[in-house]
Amino acid sequence: MADPEKILKVSVVTPDGIVYSHNATMVAMRAIDGERTIMYDHLPIVTPLAIGEVRVKRTHEMNDRVDHIAVNGGYIEFSNNEATIIADSAERARNIDVERAQSAKKRAEQHMQEAKEKHNEREMLEAEIALRRAVNRLHVRENYGK
């Protein structure tokens, strides 16, 4: 059993509500300046997140299982052993709809091609971001969505 004093609370929140909320021993994510791992008694932090995967190592009662969440940017705030990730969108691996993510990937690729043909840098950037989001969702689902 995990020592109760060594547990942190991890929540992922979007405009649609709470996507994830569990006790854990560790949370790891990609911030815009690189990988970050937070454990019990980490210094307080607020940092922006990149599009990527959040990994949450659950407590010993949960057999140290690791949950995977696709996060499309946002922020993490950590203090008093509570980590809160606020994102525009986030999905647990098991909840990602592969067909929807594949459709989003195809649309983004088409938009990139159209933007390239029009030499429209803004549309190109928007399409690249949409593509990264779709690829992230597919990666998390295909590798961890059991």
From Swiss-Prot:
It is found in: Cell membrane. One of its GO terms (molecular function) is ATP binding. The keyword Ion transport applies. GO terms for cellular component: plasma membrane; proton-transporting ATP synthase complex. Residues 102-122 are annotated as: Disordered. It comes from the Bacteria. Keywords: ATP synthesis, Cell membrane, CF(1), Hydrogen ion transport, Ion transport, Membrane, Transport. SUPFAM superfamilies: Epsilon subunit of F1F0-ATP synthase C-terminal domain (SSF46604), Epsilon subunit of F1F0-ATP synthase N-terminal domain (SSF51344). The keyword Cell membrane applies. InterPro entries: ATP_F1_dsu/esu_C_sf (IPR036794), ATP_synth_F1_dsu/esu (IPR001469), ATP_synth_F1_dsu/esu_N (IPR020546), ATP_synth_F1_esu_C (IPR020547), ATPsynth_dsu/esu_N (IPR036771). It is a peripheral membrane protein. Pfam families: ATP-synt_DE (PF00401), ATP-synt_DE_N (PF02823). Belongs to the ATPase epsilon chain family. Produces ATP from ADP in the presence of a proton gradient across the membrane. F-type ATPases have 2 components, CF(1) - the catalytic core - and CF(0) - the membrane proton channel. CF(1) has five subunits: alpha(3), beta(3), gamma(1), delta(1), epsilon(1). CF(0) has three main subunits: a, b and c. This is ATP synthase epsilon chain.
